[in-house]
Amino acid sequence: MRVLASHKHERTAQAIKEAVAAIISREVKDPRLGFVSVTKVDLARDLSQAKIYISVYGSEEDKKNSFIALNSAKGFIKGELASRVRLRIMPELYFVEDPSIEYGARIMEILEGLKKEAGENESES
C-alpha cells in the first residue's frame, strides 16, 4: 500500500481517524473492547484500503479481545464511517496494532530504573 503525501489525502486520513475514533468510543458496545485509541490512519493511494493503527492499553488478553471486537464490528464501523465522511469509495478497513505507546512507556520505565539506580550509587559513594 503506497501512501500519497498530498494535502487532500492527509486531510482525508485525518477525517477517517477522527470519525473511527468517535465511532469506536461512542457507538461500539462490545464488552470485549478494552481501552483503545486510534493513533494513525494510512490510506492507499486509490483510497481502496485504510490501515487503522490501534493502541490497546492492557494485557495481551485485552489486546486480543479488543482486536476480535474491532474485527467483528468492522462492518458496523464502515457503515457509520460512510455516513460521517463523504467519499466516492469507502475504503476497506484493516485494524493494525500500534505498539508505539507501549514502547514509549517501556522506555520511560527503563529510564526511571536507571535514574533510581544512579541515585542509589551516588548515595553509596
Swiss-Prot record:
Disulfide bonds: none
Keywords: Cytoplasm, Ribosome biogenesis
Biological processes, Gene Ontology terms: maturation of SSU-rRNA
Localization: Cytoplasm
Domain of life: Bacteria
Family annotation (Gene3D superfamilies): 3.30.300.20
GO CC term, one of those recorded: cytosol
An example molecular function term from Gene Ontology annotations: ribosomal small subunit binding
Entry keyword Cytoplasm: yes
Primary location recorded for the protein, binned into one broad class: cytoplasm
PANTHER family registered for this protein in UniProt: RIBOSOME-BINDING FACTOR A, CHLOROPLASTIC-RELATED
Assembly mode: Monomer. Binds 30S ribosomal subunits, but not 50S ribosomal subunits or 70S ribosomes.
Function, as annotated: One of several proteins that assist in the late maturation steps of the functional core of the 30S ribosomal subunit. Associates with free 30S ribosomal subunits (but not with 30S subunits that are part of 70S ribosomes or polysomes). Required for efficient processing of 16S rRNA. May interact with the 5'-terminal helix region of 16S rRNA.
Family according to the record: Belongs to the RbfA family.
Designated name of the protein: Ribosome-binding factor A
Biological source species: Carboxydothermus hydrogenoformans (strain ATCC BAA-161 / DSM 6008 / Z-2901)
